[in-house]
């Protein structure tokens, strides 16, 4: 009579068994062209994986370990231009994630266990910086800077994804055009707008996102004007600020 191994002994033997050799698999299109090439081991993806378009151009390259994406993933557009390059660890994004448009980098972000963390940079299609943020637990948290044509136009602060504290807007010459404070994403405190020479133009007090009382307005010589009605020069300056001039 044959002696059956104890179940625990069988489990140990199975665990000690060496993994099988990786098997190459290819998916082909109607004309026989390779559309996907990957490696499998013990029924799961293990090794390089590549995807191609019908002309043979590479669309995606990555790597798997025991069924989980691990390493660098690179994605290309149909014309061969880079779309995204990111790092994975155990199946989730972990490390640098760079995104491209027309071959130019438009965002750079660090990922930690699948969640955005650390510095986040955004660029326009000319490659000029448009935003510099900091992420914590997937939310904007900390100082934030925004740019237009490489010129700083706003400095703000965020807390857990909400604007918090002072926010300052700048003109192309670096002068302050507006300053205000936020509490939990709502205007809270004085909002001040300025003439191009830096003189105070308007001041409005906010509480929990709503104005309190009438605004105080001043002409370019610093003289108080009618609170109930903005003068034409004040209105024109407000229009400029709205347009971003």
Per-region residue spans from a language model:
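Glycine/tyrosine- and acidic-biased, solvent-exposed loop/turn segments at the edges of beta-strands
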Residues: 1-245
């Amino acid at each position: 009579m044959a002696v059956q191994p104890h179940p625990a002994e069988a489990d140990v033997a199975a665990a000690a068994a060496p993994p099988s050799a990786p098997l190459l698999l290819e998916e082909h299109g109607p004309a026989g062209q390779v559309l996907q090439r990957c490696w499998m081991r013990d029924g799961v993806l293990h090794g390089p994986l590549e995807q191609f378009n019908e002309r043979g151009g590479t669309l995606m390259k990555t790597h798997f370990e025991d069924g989980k994406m691990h390493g660098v993933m690179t994605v290309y557009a149909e014309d061969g231009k880079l779309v995204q390059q990111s790092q994975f660890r155990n199946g989730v994004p972990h490390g640098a994630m760079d995104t491209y448009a027309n071959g130019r980098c438009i965002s750079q972000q660090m990922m930690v266990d699948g969640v955005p963390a650390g510095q986040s940079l955004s660029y326009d299609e000319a490659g000029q910086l448009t935003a510099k943020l900091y992420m914590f637990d997937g939310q904007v948290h900390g100082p934030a800077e925004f740019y237009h044509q490489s010129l700083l136009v706003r400095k703000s602060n965020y807390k857990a994804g909400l604007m918090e504290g002072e926010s300052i807007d700048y003109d192309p010459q670096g002068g302050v055009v507006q300053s205000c404070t936020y509490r939990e994403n709502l205007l809270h405190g004085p909002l001040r707008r300025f003439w191009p020479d830096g003189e105070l133009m308007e001041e409005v007090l906010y509480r929990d996102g709503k104005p309190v009382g009438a605004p105080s307005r001043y002409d370019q010589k610093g003289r108080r004007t009618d609170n109930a009605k903005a003068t034409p020069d004040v209105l024109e300056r407000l229009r400029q600020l709205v347009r971003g001039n």
